[in-house]
């Protein structure tokens, strides 16, 4: 799976460098290729820490955070880069759908206790309704499975907060970008595929990480969410 994704990325003219982090030794074989850097961790790091290390090796004016289980039916980068270059967004994401073509919850409103309670009771879960014909649209936050940053803005904001081991690091960095006046947007016209693995609903350790990250996010941003929370 990872090898196929790396090969596909190298086929895109817009991709000048691929940085792959082996956090645990269970990836399939990735054939060494020009402009591919493989970082082998001696012990597992968190999501944010891994991407901060990767960014330290990145040389391009754009930095893409990409999960290895993302599938790219078409090259998303021409449209995404054109949208970044023509607007003010600091980070841009495509719309994410599952294998059945149904939208994933990859662009959402900032979490609040009220919104979380509504979700638990079967109400609205905070996701945006994205229309494929829409142009780039401001949203509160986009999921870390696919985030295309302006490298200068990622650096200026200090990258991911490594105190989030797993979960909420994407919400946190988008919150900090909005607070700094750096917009977060999604491009509904461009779609990628992802089948979410809700590990936090199945594994006790992931549940603990999820709860700890949620608590840290609310402690860090409680009462201090950006004034510009888009509807």
For every predicted segment, state its role.
Residues 63:
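Short aromatic/hydrophobic "clamp" motif used to bind/position activated sugar donors
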